[in-house]
Amino acid sequence: EAARPGFDPDYSHEIYGRLLHSTMAARMPDGDYESLKKHVDELDPDDQSEVARTQRAQVSSFKEWAAANELRHRIRWQWHDFFENYDVLLTPTTPTPAFKHDHRKFGDRTLMVDNEERNYFEGVFWAGLSGVAYLPSTILPTGLGVDGLPIGVQIIGPEYSDLVTIGLAG
């Protein structure tokens, strides 16, 4: 049966990105952080590119982080409602089969999806769908792609159902 939670998955990904990028930036050296903050202050307010959104999240205030965290909790409640009717949700693991590791700087990395170069952060879309809401997910390998790299399916369960998702994958 086709089933979808009651929220826009792209919106969920945006919230995931805000929270993830702000958390990751906490480890940024002070000088780099100050330089990035100055750069962000000079961004065009209408610039909603992935790079601009990432940079804004990296220098967000605690107030902005807390607002995004509140949105996360609203998403969590929508997941709670979803799992009142479904035991688990099956999703892809990534938008592509596994790919070779890219050692370039994170911002320079890209993914090929249907012969189109895409933003590397899109690769964590499916992981973020469960991760932003603290939901357990287990990856079940399902085979190998044409290049010999693995393909899998993600099993997402309700909060605290780790053993359910692991059991289904087992």
Regions found by a protein language model. Name each.
Residues 19-80, 96, 101-103, 141-149:
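Short helix-loop capping/hinge segments that flank enzyme active sites or metal/cofactor-binding pockets
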Residues 99-123:
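Short, surface-exposed loop/helix-turn segments at secondary-structure junctions
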Residues 66-70, 74-77, 85, 119, ...:
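Structural helix-boundary/capping segments
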Residues 23-40, 118-124, 160-170:
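Short, basic, helix/turn surface patches
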Residues 12-22, 106-107, 153-155:
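Short low-complexity, flexible loop/linker segments enriched in glycine and/or proline
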